[in-house]
Amino acid sequence: NDQHHAERLRRFGVATASCLGAYTTVPDSYSFLPSWIQPCSFGRIQGELIRYAKSSPNLLSGTPAELLHKGILKGENCCMSIQGNSIIIKPATQSSTLSIKNVELPTGDITIFIEAETITPPDANSDLVPRFIYASLSNLPDYEPEKKTKEFFTDLYGLVGHEKNENSFYFRRPKVSAGKQTLTITIKGTEQLQIHSIKIYNRPDIIIRQFENAVVCVNPSLEEQEIHLSDFI
């Protein structure tokens, strides 16, 4: 029922925020709140955030520089150059696009990690304004045509600022057959961007973190997952 579903979502939100360090679970910090919204006492964080997807092989072979050099990574409305293992993107318009075609993907959920940072602030306030970076795959399941539904399931986005940061993009792909897919990355704004890595994994974006009184696992997939915590903790 709705009440049971709402409780599951609340627990999901508390667990996710706690793992990301955005929500404290030390009881005294929230003693002023009503009991029905106080978090469970996980205690203080004891370990680093674990990304379960990264325990599987990376399906995209090569650094961004290698992908560009081999002609696998292509861009529209931008100029690209190589710097070490990374690439520098200089947009020509307010929206530029990168694409990697013929990525061989198995069936099942896919998590993509993109590590990037902006490098040339056009004005004094730009370091306070992050950039939007979008990612999408071809041949995703059909969802409702409403904009918000597509943003939630297929046209995912993250934020990139002036410190190197890794965004994750998680795609649920029930009943999608294995085959060659296209990864599309869209960058908003005209500020130069440096992409350090692009990695693709055939696992849900499950996060795990150890606390004083608990080990918290957050599973955003639509299916149950079997995780051997001894492999991570």
Regions found by a protein language model. Give the residues of each.
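Active-site-proximal substrate-binding groove within the catalytic cores of carbohydrate-active enzymes
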Residues: 1-142, 151, 155-157, 161-162, ...
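Short, surface-exposed loop motifs enriched in S/T, G, D/E and P with embedded aromatic residues
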Residues: 145
